[in-house]
Amino acid sequence: MKMQYRLLIIIVGLMAVVSFFYWRWPIMTGKLNGQTIYLAVLNSFHVKDSHAHPQFMLIDDDSGKGIYKIREICERVGVKATFAVVPAFLDSARCDSLKKWQQEGYGIALHSYDHGRWKDWTKEEVVSDIDRSLAFLRERGFETNKINLVVTPGFYNTRAIRSAVATKGMKMIMGANVVNPDTTTSQWGRLFIKKETDIDETRGVLLRAKEKKGFVVFGTHSSIPDEFSAEKTEEILRIAHQIGLKLK
């Protein structure tokens, strides 16, 4: 009899766990990886902001020559992107352009000083690298008090990186194909727009995000021609804008 009760308790417990994750599991796309599962589980326990509304943003990595294409797309659609800069990759012209755009309302995020392997670094080394990037931008006239987002190079996510970013009071973008529950979480997933991205599938994700009042972060590598699609980037931003997601 005791065995039957134990079995019943186990079954009820498993059903409760499955039910919990079923209702709270976030929207995901693409291939599963360790970071996607990690963030999905983390977000399942997140207490959603009661004032949340569906939002989106675009982050373009590496601050290469493709930033001008992103700027053109944003101006046509009527949105403003955030540029994840790598100071060591910047020439004076792009630096001046990004500084001017920040003054116009475009965002600036950090993407390490020279795209180093943060995966193998200590917390202190990551903090030092963040400080070095901020100092570079500050010296060139950027408003570094407005920079509060770190896009980890290589999408690495280690305890040292998380601790370093938290120490700086910033949020981080990781390599997880997850729609975020809202903007209050400290780690954000991101959906990349590439040449092979399915527009209809992405529209479906955006509609579900709107229904759940989620926060969609899109990513692009505008400076990698083999990956970047200006046409799909513009179309997806228009869809997000048209179905009612607000720009973060």
Regions found by a protein language model. Give the residues of each.
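A conditional alpha-helix N-cap/helix-loop micro-motif detector
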Residues: 91, 195-199
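A short, acidic, amphipathic alpha-helical segment used as a generic capping/interface helix at domain edges
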Residues: 198-209
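Metal-dependent polysaccharide deacetylase catalytic core of the NodB/CE4 family, i.e.
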Residues: 53-56, 69, 75-163, 167-171, ...
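Short secondary-structure boundary/capping segments
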Residues: 47-49, 99-100, 207-208
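A structural signal for short, well-ordered beta-strand segments and their strand-loop junctions
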Residues: 172-175, 246-248
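N-terminal pre-catalytic segment of deacetylase/amide-hydrolase enzymes
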Residues: 4, 8-58, 65-68, 76, ...
